[in-house]
Regions:
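Metal-dependent nuclease catalytic regions and adjoining charged, substrate-binding loops involved
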Residues: 14-69, 76-180, 187, 317-347, ...
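Short acidic loop-to-beta-strand element that houses the catalytic metal-binding Asp/Glu
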Residues: 1-3, 272
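Flexible loop/turn segments at secondary-structure boundaries
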Residues: 4-5, 102-104, 186, 276-280, ...
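N-terminal accessory regions of nucleic-acid-interacting proteins
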Residues: 200-267
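Cys/His-rich short segments
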Residues: 169-214
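Conserved RNase H-like, two-metal-ion catalytic cores of nucleic-acid enzymes
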Residues: 9-26, 256-343
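Structural beta-strand/beta-sheet cores of well-ordered domains, especially the beta-sheet scaffolds
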Residues: 175, 181, 213, 266-271, ...
Length: 364
């Protein structure tokens, strides 16, 4: 990961000195180390409380912010206990080493063509977050976790023991618990299309009825889409979805489709990028995890149904990905699109994910 998870304005780890007041980042940078902004928390009582609340997010192992600090806290437990057992009482500092989202590669390479990541404008490729205070605060929790796991090993719960689900189950993530289907055998047999968490736009909360999120739906016994009372649905789209499910029908809004189709002008450029989010930047001005474009495909539909499979289909591929071919890629894009006299595109570009393709074009 990168430091932006903890330091970017969009990350949400900011606190204020009063309601609607000045916002301060939870971490401030000193050299190449990000440290907790304890000084700003002393400005007002409100700031102190707000600071502790934001810091508490780092102490939630299931939050987006607490996962890595929790891992580091367990490492601290193991390291310190091993050192003490060996009679070594030297203090150890604990930092989270992450890639620097502000580092832009300058393109330097050695004699063998390998990237050389020099310090650029005071920015290092790897930066550090000081987690000494956070990992120390985690130690009491780590001890409880160890005791809990030891109790599970000593006396496992029967398979059908009633348990609750929560964010610790990590459904749909790469850390998803492998045992959740054993805890909820009935849920295992619910078809995916009939799951209660399949309402459009990930609608899984019904706050007026005391249910917040997909886990609470399951814990309250609402496992299937039609378990949720129809009267709870307030969105028109959800009502349509439920009606289609209950009656086995389809809903097709031809008027909306026709309105959208009428805006399309020929030729249509069916366009798609392929990218590689490389952790280490490979080419000049790239940053860590930048979506590095290595291929595009273009299919030009000249008129309704008119697209010659030879003349109107183009693919640009940086097959080896070792050389920087972004300039050639951009020129190939320009060469295959038609433009009006004022520089605007002649026709319509269609992409599966418009915001993604637009973002890559802006970066190029």
């Amino acid at each position: 990961t990168t430091n932006s998870k903890y330091t970017d304005a969009k990350a949400g780890l900011f606190f204020s000195d009063k309601r609607g007041g000045t916002k301060y980042p939870l971490f401030v940078k000193e050299g190449n180390i990000w440290r907790l902004n304890a000084l700003a928390s002393t400005k007002t009582d409100y700031a102190a409380k707000n600071y502790e609340a934001k810091k508490g997010l780092l102490l939630d192992r299931y939050s987006n912010y607490g996962k890595y600090p929790h891992d580091l806290a367990f490492q601290r437990y193991v390291i310190e206990h091993a050192l003490r057992k060996a009679g070594d009482n030297r203090p150890v500092n604990f930092y989270l080493a992450v890639l620097n989202s502000e580092y832009a590669f300058d393109g330097t390479r050695d004699a063998n063509g390998n990237c050389v990541y020099n310090q650029i404008g005071g920015q290092e490729l790897v930066t550090f977050l000081d987690m000494n205070e956070i990992t120390l605060a985690y130690q009491t929790f780590i001890l409880k976790e160890i005791a809990m796991l030891e109790s599970y090993i000593a006396k496992p719960n029967p398979v059908n023991t009633k348990v609750t689900v929560g964010n610790w189950c990590a459904w749909g993530k790469n850390t998803e618990c492998v045992f959740w289907k054993h805890c909820f055998q009935k849920l295992r047999d619910v078809p995916d299309y009939n799951s209660a968490n399949k309402y459009l736009n990930s609608h899984q909360s019904f706050k007026d009825y005391g249910i917040v999120g997909k886990y609470e739906l399951v814990n309250q016994g609402y496992w299937q889409l039609d378990d949720v009372p129809s009267g709870w649905l307030t969105s028109e789209n959800h009502k349509i979805q439920r009606d289609c499910f209950d009656n086995g029908t389809e809903h097709i809004d031809k008027e909306k489709m026709r309105f959208w189709l009428d805006k399309i002008e020929y030729p249509i450029y069916h366009f798609d990028f392929e990218t590689f989010p490389c952790p280490l930047p490979r080419f000049k001005r790239e940053t860590p995890y930048r979506q590095s474009v290595f291929e595009f495909s273009l299919h030009i539909e000249r008129a309704p149904g008119v697209c010659d499979k030879q003349k109107d289909n183009f693919i640009f591929l940086n097959a080896e990905c070792a050389d920087d071919e972004r300039e050639a890629l951009v020129k190939a894009i320009v060469d295959h699109f038609e433009f009006n006299a004022d520089g605007t595109l002649h026709g319509t570009m269609l992409a599966q994910n418009t915001s993604f393709e637009r973002g890559r074009l802006n970066e190029l």
